[in-house]
Amino acid sequence: MYISKQPFRKSKQPFRKSKQPFHKSKQPFRKFKQPFRKSKQPFRRRSRIGPGDRIDYRNMSLINRFISEQGKILSRRINRLTLKQQRLITLAIKQARILSFLPFRNYENEKQFQAQAISIITGPRHRKNRHIPQLTQKFNSNRNLRNSNQNLRNNNRNLSSDC
């Protein structure tokens, strides 16, 4: 196998040097590989469970810290617990509910919470008078026509089936 090498071709245009001198900036140029990278600094959260606290369904003062106003179990992110602690707390809460130490849901607070949430989302409600008598009359007359046509069709079917 013989591979022919082609000669290096020179370009016909001459190489132009830049007339502006190259100035190095005082700050080094930083090239970020991932611009929105999350910082990986170690963090230590203080647990809401003390070293002497027993996670048990009878320890109501401890359990009540990990339940929301509506009676729901709060998430690990909110509780700032380890996985093992969260599992034990969840089991204790469920046992307390079954043994009727805790309600399954706190309906009084839940109703208040829902009312507040709805008012925040929708804002104040203003009723507008949108009643236009001409349009409602037109709509009702169309509805009456449709109903009468439907009745006629049903009568025709009944007559044809009788024969």
Curated annotation (Swiss-Prot):
* Compositional bias per record (Basic residues), positions renumbered to this chain: 7-48
Q: Name one GO biological process term.
A: translation
Q: Which UniProt keywords apply?
A: Chloroplast, Plastid, Ribonucleoprotein, Ribosomal protein, RNA-binding, rRNA-binding
Pfam family of this protein, just one?
Answer: Ribosomal_S18
Query: What are the record's GO terms for cellular component?
Result: chloroplast; mitochondrial small ribosomal subunit
Its principal location? Answer: plastid
Is Ligase one of the keywords UniProt gives this record?
no
Q: Which InterPro entries match?
A: Ribosomal_bS18 (IPR001648), Ribosomal_bS18_CS (IPR018275), Ribosomal_bS18_sf (IPR036870)
Record-linked HAMAP family: Ribosomal_bS18
Q: What is this protein called?
A: Small ribosomal subunit protein bS18c
Source organism per UniProt? Saccharum officinarum (Sugarcane)
Q: What is the lineage of its organism?
A: Eukaryota, Viridiplantae, Streptophyta, Embryophyta, Tracheophyta
Q: Which gene encodes it?
A: rps18
